[in-house]
């Protein structure tokens, strides 16, 4: 039976590879038809704003002030949130923003915002900002942003209606929004842990003291009185207005270090800790925390008080902004060093160095395209949150794609394929007669895999990162004509459903650990993205979906694919495949309907 299934599937895969060109042509034609059918569709929460940049909107360089841009962004996003909620909304946070392009006088700013996903009373709004030159008709991407808004009603508690995504892009954003929300909820604790665990070497002793600027010289303090024009229809201060004031004092602090007009390149998350109303006095404080070779970090905090006689001030916001100084060719210039004050100044100095490392790790892991990220990424405490996020979001985004092609169907097990650039992805699904929570329990603990999957010889738990993330060392038998067995170092991230209709997720990807380097007795394998998604279909019914990504040339050369680990031996692009026949894996998956979770051992047991 297994051999017959394997033969059928191998023939199906051979058909997939031999007819790749015709499938791609048919897929393009289908996409063109779908686009034509959906030309009239527009997201009901989408809000657009277009503003002509006037001299009153610009800074000393004749470019649009980032503070003014932040106000426009916040207004557009708030209107989108209120369109969905049907009631007033307030800004809760704004994720990290990286500015790719500046905007000059006479150009147009086009801002588009739409709700990606709604939770109980909060929602994530995605914002895209582009600039347009009316004379040359050229357009540039300026930045992307993600904001969280909270719906507010005075009498009843808000329960937001759910978003129903329609397009592929909407499905991807909707799926990943839950993981981004997870990151935001633990953001403060994550930063504290990372800063506590990151050993940042001090280099103050090796720096040229003649070029040092005392940090105290960059300190700025400014007070603002919140007036009715600064507030929304609820009397709360506009989040965008507070962000604009913060950008203003940060720019002054940066200018005092470099004695030039700096350019803001990035903002770390704005998090509104409390509200501010008309009549409040806001005290904004800024100081340069650290100066690197071509950039500097400025820390800003905002405190509010109601009356001059009040002794207690409310901390309502903090942010860290990265500035550069550009020359005539728009290249960053060298900056003078900063000399921090003893005590808190030295603490801020080292924390800024840690945050820089975190930003680089985050940008490398999260922002890079799939083709730019190596199969294995080094794991350490400074990037664990972003590796887990990338692990889960990559799998969710792959599952959400709507251009999968049905390649084969055998005994109600469907195999889909998707070719994209140099990657060929597989998507296998079937309905199993087992509760989704039980299937999730079985599949999420890799230590139980050798009990029911013959391609897992041994699994060792290397590190329990947190409740839902763990790193395993996996070995598999020597297959495919190789004399050496393979081993893998795998980050496994599991997620329970965030809401009704969400899947259980088990995401796998390779990482590297200094404690588990390559050894002569094993061929080190790597996996880019693979895992399971499980949907509850009814009482004791679960739709089980397994997905993985492979390099196209390896699949074409070998004609095989593996169940849980798509491997490539390090340094050998034409080798390293396990050579596992699909029939064995299909029979393993089909065994789930006649299985149960053993409460004592936790593995799949035939009934």
UniProtKB/Swiss-Prot annotation:
UniProt entry tagged with the keyword Cytoplasm: yes
Compartments in which it is found: Mitochondrion matrix; Cytoplasm
GO biological process: acyl-CoA metabolic process; fatty acid metabolic process; intracellular signal transduction; negative regulation of cold-induced thermogenesis; response to cold; response to temperature stimulus
Induction line: By cold exposure and repressed by heat exposure.
Tissue expression from the record: Isoform 1 is predominantly expressed in skeletal muscle, liver, testis, stomach, spleen, lung and brain. Isoform 2 is predominantly expressed in kidney, uterus, hibernoma and white adipose tissue.
Sites where the protein binds CoA: 91-93, 120-122, 181, 271-273
Record PTM Phosphoserine, positions in chain: 15, 25
Record's catalysed reaction(s): hexadecanoyl-CoA + H2O = hexadecanoate + CoA + H(+); tetradecanoyl-CoA + H2O = tetradecanoate + CoA + H(+); dodecanoyl-CoA + H2O = dodecanoate + CoA + H(+); butanoyl-CoA + H2O = butanoate + CoA + H(+)
Keywords, sorted A to Z: Cytoplasm, Fatty acid metabolism, Hydrolase, Lipid metabolism, Mitochondrion, Phosphoprotein, Repeat, Serine esterase, Transit peptide
Chain's role: Has an acyl-CoA thioesterase activity with a preference for the long chain fatty acyl-CoA thioesters hexadecanoyl-CoA/palmitoyl-CoA and tetradecanoyl-CoA/myristoyl-CoA which are the main substrates in the mitochondrial beta-oxidation pathway.
Protein name as it appears in the record: Acyl-coenzyme A thioesterase 11
């Amino acid at each position: 039976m297994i051999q017959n299934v394997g033969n059928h599937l191998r023939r199906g895969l051979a058909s997939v590879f031999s007819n790749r060109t015709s499938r791609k042509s048919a897929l393009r034609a289908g996409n063109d038809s779908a686009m034509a059918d959906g030309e009239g569709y527009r997201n009901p929460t989408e809000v657009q704003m277009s503003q002509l940049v006037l001299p009153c909107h610009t800074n000393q360089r004749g470019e649009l002030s980032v503070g003014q841009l932040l106000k426009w962004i916040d207004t557009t996003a708030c209107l989108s949130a209120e369109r969905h909620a049907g009631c007033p909304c307030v800004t809760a946070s704004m994720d990290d923003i990286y500015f790719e392009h500046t905007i000059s006088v006479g150009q147009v700013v086009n801002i588009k915002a739409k709700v990606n996903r709604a939770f109980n009373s909060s929602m994530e709004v995605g914002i895209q900002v582009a600039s347009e030159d009316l004379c040359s008709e050229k357009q540039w991407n300026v930045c992307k942003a993600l904001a969280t808004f909270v719906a507010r009603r005075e009498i009843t508690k808000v329960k937001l209606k759910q978003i129903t995504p329609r397009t592929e892009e909407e499905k991807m954003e909707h799926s990943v929004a839950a993981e981004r929300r997870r990151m935001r909820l633990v953001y403060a604790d994550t930063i504290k842990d990372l800063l506590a665990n990151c050993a940042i070497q001090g280099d103050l002793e090796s720096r040229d003291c003649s070029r040092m600027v005392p940090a105290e010289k960059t300190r700025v303090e400014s007070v603002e009185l919140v007036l009715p024009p600064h507030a929304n229809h609820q009397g709360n201060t506009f989040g965008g207005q507070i962000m604009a004031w913060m950008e203003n004092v940060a720019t002054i602090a940066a200018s005092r270090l470099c004695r030039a007009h700096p350019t803001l390149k990035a903002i770390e998350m704005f998090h509104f800790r409390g509200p501010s109303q008309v009549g409040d006095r806001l005290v904004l404080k800024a100081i340069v925390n650290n100066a690197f070779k071509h950039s500097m970090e400025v820390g800003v905090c905002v405190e509010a008080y109601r009356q001059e006689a009040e002794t207690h001030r409310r901390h309502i916001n903090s942010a860290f902004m990265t500035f550069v100084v550009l020359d005539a060719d728009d290249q960053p210039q060298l900056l003078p060093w900063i000399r921090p004050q003893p005590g808190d100044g030295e603490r801020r100095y080292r924390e800024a160095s840690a945050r820089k490392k975190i930003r680089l790790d985050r940008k490398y892991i999260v922002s890079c395209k799939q083709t730019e990220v190596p199969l294995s990424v080094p794991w350490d405490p400074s990037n664990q949150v972003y590796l887990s996020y990338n692990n889960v979001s990559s799998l969710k985004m792959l599952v959400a794609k709507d251009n999968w092609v049905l390649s084969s169907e055998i005994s109600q097990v469907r195999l889909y394929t998707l070719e994209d650039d140099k990657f060929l992805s597989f998507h296998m699904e079937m309905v199993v007669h087992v509760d989704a929570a039980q299937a999730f329990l079985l599949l999420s603990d890799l230590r139980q895999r050798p009990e029911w999957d013959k391609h897992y010889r041994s699994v060792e738990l290397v590190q329990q990162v947190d409740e839902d993330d763990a790193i395993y060392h996996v070995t598999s038998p020597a297959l495919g004509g190789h004399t050496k067995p393979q081993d893998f170092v795998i980050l496994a991230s599991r997620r329970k459903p965030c809401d009704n209709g969400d899947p259980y997720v088990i995401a796998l990807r390779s990482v590297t650990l200094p404690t588990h380097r390559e050894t002569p007795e094993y061929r080190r394998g790597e996996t880019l993205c693979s895992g399971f998604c499980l949907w509850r279909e009814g009482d004791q019914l679960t739709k089980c979906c397994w997905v993985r990504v492979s390099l196209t040339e390896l699949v074409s050369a070998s004609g095989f694919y593996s169940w849980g680990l798509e491997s490539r031996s390090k340094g050998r692009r034409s080798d390293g495949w396990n050579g596992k026949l699909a029939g064995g894996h299909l029979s393993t998956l089909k065994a789930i309907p006649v299985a149960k979770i053993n409460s004592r051992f936790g593995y799949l047991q035939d009934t």
